[in-house]
């Protein structure tokens, strides 16, 4: 599919004005903008949570390795 040309955009705009009236269009645009902003914010929040969980798992693995290394080192010293 291709994007509408300039004339097609004008026809679409005219239909929107006829359907909603000139006074409602700024309100609709404002609501649409807020909706898009909220969506983007939620997407960023989900990405942050995912990164945090991944980091926590990496730290947990590193801690397990450190504990095992210390246990092995203590066993070597005792022997």
Swiss-Prot record:
Task of the protein: Part of the twin-arginine translocation (Tat) system that transports large folded proteins containing a characteristic twin-arginine motif in their signal peptide across membranes. TatA could form the protein-conducting channel of the Tat system.
Family stated for the protein in its record: Belongs to the TatA/E family.
Organism the protein comes from: Campylobacter lari (strain RM2100 / D67 / ATCC BAA-1060)
Lineage: Bacteria, Pseudomonadati, Campylobacterota, Epsilonproteobacteria, Campylobacterales
Membrane topology: Single-pass membrane protein
Protein name according to UniProt: Sec-independent protein translocase protein TatA
Subunit structure: The Tat system comprises two distinct complexes: a TatABC complex, containing multiple copies of TatA, TatB and TatC subunits, and a separate TatA complex, containing only TatA subunits. Substrates initially bind to the TatABC complex, which probably triggers association of the separate TatA complex to form the active translocon.
Molecular functions (GO terms): protein transmembrane transporter activity
Protein's UniProt keywords contain Ribosomal protein: no
One Pfam family from the record: TatA_B_E
Cell compartments where the protein resides: Cell inner membrane
